[in-house]
């Protein structure tokens, strides 16, 4: 599964399009990602504290109507907005993804995913990046137990060891790769933001690293 991440309010053009409910820039970026091989699209509307529910519904309906019910990851800290997006989501091509939970203040997003038969990206942290793989696995186990106690299948929890910036944290990269192997050995799914690796690198280098 490849999740396209370029529909994010961190990009000024996308933020403007979401704010103005302008479909064209959203559709254009979505098509570019799907043409490049994305199988899911991440819809990051930011905190969206004022109009998040309406905005997420609008974005979900726009993208799924334009691209044959493309599966989506709903990405916001606003839980009500995620629930609103799920309420209009068509599952024919795949379950919605809740992006994301962690083992700290955001662990309730696992509850949200369980209640809505959704996949949940589970960040192996508790607000801060884990210091080592022992800590990552502790967080992983806590979230796995939480999800399964609520009736989730283990396959619907996608564990993210948190990819780190190569430019300043090269010594930590092997730990992240080892964590992915540990997840696999446990029969668990993993995911990660590959573009985090290239953050801060020269623009001509980033596409090579991200690929």
Language model regions located:
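Domain-level signal for soluble alpha/beta catalytic cores
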Residues: 1-157, 164-211
